[in-house]
């Protein structure tokens, strides 16, 4: 972006200056509305989410047999919700900032099959595509026991079709493993940020991995192009897919059930704050949408991004969405948080969700490494760097009197609050890689 343009952008949006300087930045969104007001802009409804629930239930008998690690939950891919009181104390000590309320962790990092939040959206979209093909071919009805999809005739049928996706790692992992298991030929276009172990794991499942020297946006574009030339190839579009988004949104009702099981209350007197790491935006956008449908105006969602990849904060704050990238303002999009190394946000997610998100913040790689170490020490939970992005959120909220006043929170409401950090990945990181992460914390 030439200087004159850049200067006028900064004059209009002074916060951009802090982003360019790679400062850890927090922006509380003045444009938030009620769910009733913001929902029409999403373009999806509660019924769409219910349909996704129903589809995952139909596939549960299949998943329970195809992936024995899901048998205990009857083929439902869901993660634990745990309190992390020792980490809460450690954060308060390190940052000299009390966190009022209780700190919880949602362990999507340990979801079965692919060990990340992408096991929600990625697997769901592959299943939705497989169902559509099998229904159209007359091989399946909605009333069938879907475990029949494990038969050789279905494997044979699906092998005529292929799936392509562009990814920094975790989405590729979930889509690759699921597609290969069901019988599709699958190609994952991996950006330069993708970890070597993720590529190796995919190849071990018979997935074709195409590697790029460039970032996520290029990998997606190349994947899209490659798929266009083959009518039997289905491209899963992380930037624009409503299906992926709905796969993530199912998490809302499921979390509501987990809260009820644990006797946790969310209402006007007991607000819920949720902190979601954000790459291109599909995962956190879908989850936040589901949470809003489940808890209404009593849930407050925040997106967390690396200082080197603040694409969603930049897009929503300036209103330019996918018309601007972090590279346009001179930021390199290089971060240890490989799952969040995205320079241009999803325009679909930004426009759909901008009224339903309370805020956005950035944190440095070093901050993620530090918190990764603290969590391992205090709670014995090991995550990958991206998954710690949410962990900085509770301090930002508890330290901001202006945010609390903007929403009219009383001291008592804050004392009764629940702060939920969404841990997005790390359950499958190899031991030696994890040791390297732990060594970088202070």
UniProtKB/Swiss-Prot annotation:
InterPro entries: D_Ser_am_lyase, Ser/Thr_Dehydratase, Ser/Thr_deHydtase_PyrdxlP-BS, TrpB-like_PALP, TrpB-like_PALP_sf. It catalyses: D-serine = pyruvate + NH4(+). The modification N6-(pyridoxal phosphate)lysine is found at residue 118. Coiled coil: none annotated. CDD domains: D-Ser-dehyd. It comes from the Bacteria. Its EC number is 4.3.1.18. GO terms for molecular function: D-serine ammonia-lyase activity; hydro-lyase activity; pyridoxal phosphate binding. Its cofactor is pyridoxal 5'-phosphate. GO terms for biological process: D-serine catabolic process; isoleucine biosynthetic process. SUPFAM superfamilies: Tryptophan synthase beta subunit-like PLP-dependent enzymes. PROSITE patterns: DEHYDRATASE_SER_THR. It holds the Pfam family PALP. Monomer. Belongs to the serine/threonine dehydratase family. DsdA subfamily. PANTHER family: D-SERINE DEHYDRATASE, THREONINE DEHYDRATASE, MITOCHONDRIAL-RELATED. NCBIfam families: D_Ser_am_lyase, PRK02991.1. This is D-serine dehydratase. It comes from Escherichia coli O157:H7. The gene is dsdA.
């Amino acid at each position: 972006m030439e200087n004159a343009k850049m200067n006028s952008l900064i004059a209009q949006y002074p916060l951009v200056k802090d982003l360019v300087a790679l400062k850890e930045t927090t922006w509380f969104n003045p444009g938030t509305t009620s769910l009733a007001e913001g929902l029409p802009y999403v373009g999806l409804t509660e019924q769409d989410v219910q349909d996704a629930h129903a589809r995952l239930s139909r596939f549960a008998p299949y998943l329970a047999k195809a992936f024995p690690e899901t048998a205990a939950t009857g083929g439902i891919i869901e993660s634990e919700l745990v309190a992390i009181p020792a980490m809460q104390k450690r954060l308060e000590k390190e940052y000299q900032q009390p966190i009022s309320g209780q700190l919880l962790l949602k362990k999507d990092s340990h979801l079965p099959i692919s060990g990340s939040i992408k096991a929600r959206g990625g697997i769901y979209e592959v299943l939705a595509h497989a169902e559509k093909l099998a229904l159209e071919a007359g091989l399946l009805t909605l009333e069938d026991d879907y475990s029949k999809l494990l038969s050789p005739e279905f494997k044979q049928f699906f092998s005529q079709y292929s799936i392509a996706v562009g990814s920094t790692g975790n989405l590729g992992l979930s889509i690759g493993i699921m597609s290969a298991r069901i019988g599709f030929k699958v190609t994952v276009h991996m950006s330069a940020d993708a970890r070597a172990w993720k590529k190796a794991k995919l190849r071990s499942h018979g997935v074709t991995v195409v590697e790029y020297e460039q970032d996520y946006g290029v990998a997606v574009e190349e994947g899209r192009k490659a798929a266009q030339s083959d009518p039997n190839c289905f491209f899963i579009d992380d930037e624009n897919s409503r299906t992926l988004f709905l796969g993530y949104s199912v998490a809302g009702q499921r979390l509501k059930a987990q809260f009820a099981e644990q006797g946790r209350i969310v209402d006007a007197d007991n607000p819920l704050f949720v902190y979601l790491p954000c790459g291109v935006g599909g995962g956190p956008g879908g989850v936040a949408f589901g949470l809003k449908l489940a808890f209404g105006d009593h849930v407050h969602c925040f997106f967390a991004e690396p200082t080197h990849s603040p694409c969603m904060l930049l897009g929503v704050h300036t209103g330019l969405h996918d018309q601007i990238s972090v590279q346009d303002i001179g930021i390199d999009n290089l971060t240890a948080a490989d799952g969040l190394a995205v320079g241009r946000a999803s325009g679909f997610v930004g426009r759909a969700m901008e009224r339903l998100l309370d805020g956005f913040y950035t944190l440095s790689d070093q901050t993620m490494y530090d918190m990764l170490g603290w969590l391992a020490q205090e709670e014995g939970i090991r995550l990958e760097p991206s998954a710690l992005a949410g962990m900085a959120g509770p301090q930002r909220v508890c330290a901001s009197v202006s945010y609390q006043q903007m929403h009219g929170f009383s001291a008592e409401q804050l004392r009764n609050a629940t702060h939920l950090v969404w841990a997005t990945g790390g359950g499958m990181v190899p031991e030696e890689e994890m040791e390297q992460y732990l060594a970088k914390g202070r």
